[in-house]
């Protein structure tokens, strides 16, 4: 949800989905 489902944000913050 949020940054986790946003490809650009996920690229910059890969640990957010961890």
From Swiss-Prot:
Origin: domain of life: Eukaryota
Keywords associated with the record: Acetylcholine receptor inhibiting toxin, Disulfide bond, Ion channel impairing toxin, Neurotoxin, Postsynaptic neurotoxin, Secreted, Toxin
InterPro entries documented for this protein: Conotoxin_a-typ (IPR009958), Conotoxin_a-typ_CS (IPR018072)
Disulfide bonds: 3-9, 4-17
Location in the cell: Secreted
GO terms under cellular component: extracellular region; host cell postsynaptic membrane
Molecular function as annotated in GO: acetylcholine receptor inhibitor activity; ion channel regulator activity; toxin activity
Tissue: Expressed by the venom duct.
Family: Belongs to the conotoxin A superfamily.
Free-text note on domains in this protein's UniProt record: The cysteine framework is I (CC-C-C).
Other information: Negative results: does not show effect on the muscle nAChRs alpha-1-beta-1-epsilon-delta/CHRNA1-CHRNB1-CHRNE-CHRND (adult subtype) and alpha-1-beta-1-gamma-delta/CHRNA1-CHRNB1-CHRNG-CHRND (fetal subtype).
Function according to Swiss-Prot or TrEMBL: Alpha-conotoxins act on postsynaptic membranes, they bind to the nicotinic acetylcholine receptors (nAChR) and thus inhibit them. This peptide is active on neuronal nAChRs alpha-7/CHRNA7 (IC(50) of 3.24 uM), alpha-3-beta-4/CHRNA3-CHRNB4, alpha-4-beta-2/CHRNA4-CHRNB2, and alpha-4-beta-4/CHRNA4-CHRNB4. 10 uM of this peptide inhibits these receptors by 85%, 40%, 19%, and 13%, respectively.
Annotated protein name in UniProt: Alpha-conotoxin Lo1a
């Amino acid at each position: 949800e949020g940054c986790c489902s946003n490809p650009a944000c996920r690229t910059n913050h890969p640990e957010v989905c961890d």
